Amino acid sequence: MKASLQGKLDKLADRFEELAGLLSDPDVISNQNQFRDLSREYAEIDPVVKCYRQYQQAVEDHGAAKAMQDDSDADMREMGAEEARDAQERMEALAAELQKLMLPKDPRDGANVFLEVRAGTGGDEAAIFAGDLFRMYSKYADQRGWKVEMVSASEGEHGGYKEVIARVIGDGVYSRMKFESGAHRVQRVPATESQGRIHTSACTVAIMAEAEDLGDIKIRTEDLRIDTYRSSGAGGQHVNTTDSAVRITHLPTGVVVECQDERSQHKNKARAMSLLSAKLYDAQQNAAHAEQAAERKSLVGSGDRSERIRTYNYPQGRVTDHRINLTLYRLNEIVEGDLDEILGALLAEYQADQLAALGEH
């Protein structure tokens, strides 16, 4: 292990002990904000310190095993050689894990997200596919114990959505879903197709971190135009008699957001403002990430919405992620929300890119 990395890990281990002491201090416990911030820091470095302690134990075991190889007894020397090999393997595996754990953290990883699915080319079939994608993400969220709140929806004439936006709330939502932004393509025979021909349709997905506590997104009141209108869709008679839906236009950028899901105009406005903050923050971050990705020739994590990232081929039961050349013949399970294999592979590739970038400096 590099001395520079070991030095950082030693400092983290010291900080971990310091935090443990602070979190049992009555003065800290009585200060809610300080206690929350320190608890968050403790939770963040806990897995790193645990892994480092295992690594230190493996180093110690390796030293003891090496000493056994100098023993006068042949059986002891053989046992020492075997234990040294085992300790060496553990050291290498734990050192690799520590490198990943010490990679720069994306400040957005712990954030909730706004999920936006928009039908692209393909007419009615694209809208139906947008509905399928939204259902897939909703099922994945359900499996992970996350909550999905609808923000706005424009339904397709024959099912699905022309556009749907929802807020996904839970632990580490952005860290799992951040690689889903981009163009998703479907190849299948539509229900309305009498000749049995395969059609190709597309949707774009945007994953935007909720912007609270994520940076200085300053939105001036004079830069906003706020319109209210009557909600459409579900909600009963009450919805149709009140101007509860809210549309907000950010004049400098032309970004428009709306929320019509809540009955209260005040709640709709608050949620629309949150979505606007997320969109502006997302645009700011994507510009920086696109520049970094271009420098590293990296596709995973570039966040380019026009980039075709995945194809869902129904006749072949195949899903292909084009960024990492991963093909899985598990389409039915994937569209039912079983996304862990794909998302895990994307995260591994992203971390490999980060490690390669660190190695260049």
From Swiss-Prot:
SMART domains: PCRF. It is found in: Cytoplasm. One of its GO terms (molecular function) is translation release factor activity, codon specific. HAMAP family: Rel_fac_1. Belongs to the prokaryotic/mitochondrial release factor family. PANTHER family: LD18447P (PTHR43804:SF7). This is Peptide chain release factor 1. It comes from Alcanivorax borkumensis (strain ATCC 700651 / DSM 11573 / NCIMB 13689 / SK2).
